[in-house]
C-alpha cells in the first residue's frame, strides 16, 4: 500500500512573493523570497530560508554546466513549497512582469515593436536584440 502522506506534492502549496536577496553564500542559484501571505512582512530577511530557482531544461545545472538565474531584488516570483504547508523549502518557478511602481517591467526596447522585437537586457545595460519579423 502506498503512503501518500510522504508523497512530495500531495499537499501542493504555491505562493507569489518578492525577491529580497540574491547573494547566495553557497553560490547555488538560490534567492531569499518574501512569500506574501505565509509570513508577516516584518520578518527580517535574515530569517527567511534560501529558495532554489528552477532553471529551464536548456540549463543542465550539473557539475558546473548550465546557467545562473537573472532574478533581481524586487522581482516578483511564483513558487511552491516542496515541504507543503510547512513552508520552509521553496522552489521558484518563474518571475512575473508587473507595473508595481508604475514602470513596465519589460525592456523599453521590447516595447518599441511588439511582438516581433525580442530583447534581453541585463542590469548593466547590455542588450541582445533580435528582429523576429518573418521573411
Question: Can you name each region flagged by the protein language model?
Answer:
Residues 1-135:
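Hydrophobic packing positions characteristic
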Amino acid at each position: 500500500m502506498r503512503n501518500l502522506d510522504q508523497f512530495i506534492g500531495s499537499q501542493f502549496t504555491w505562493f507569489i512573493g518578492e525577491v529580497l536577496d540574491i547573494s547566495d553564500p553557497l553560490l547555488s542559484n538560490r534567492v531569499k523570497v518574501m512569500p506574501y501571505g505565509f509570513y508577516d512582512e516584518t520578518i527580517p530577511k535574515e530569517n527567511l530560508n534560501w529558495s532554489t530557482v528552477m532553471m529551464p531544461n536548456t540549463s543542465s545545472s550539473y557539475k558546473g554546466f548550465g546557467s545562473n538565474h537573472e532574478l533581481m531584488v524586487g522581482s516578483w516570483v511564483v513558487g511552491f513549497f516542496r515541504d507543503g504547508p510547512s513552508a520552509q523549502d521553496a522552489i521558484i518557478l518563474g518571475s512575473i512582469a508587473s507595473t508595481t511602481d508604475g514602470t513596465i517591467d519589460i525592456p523599453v526596447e521590447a516595447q518599441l515593436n511588439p511582438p516581433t522585437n525580442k530583447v534581453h537586457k541585463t542590469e548593466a545595460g547590455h542588450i541582445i536584440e533580435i528582429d523576429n519579423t518573418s521573411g
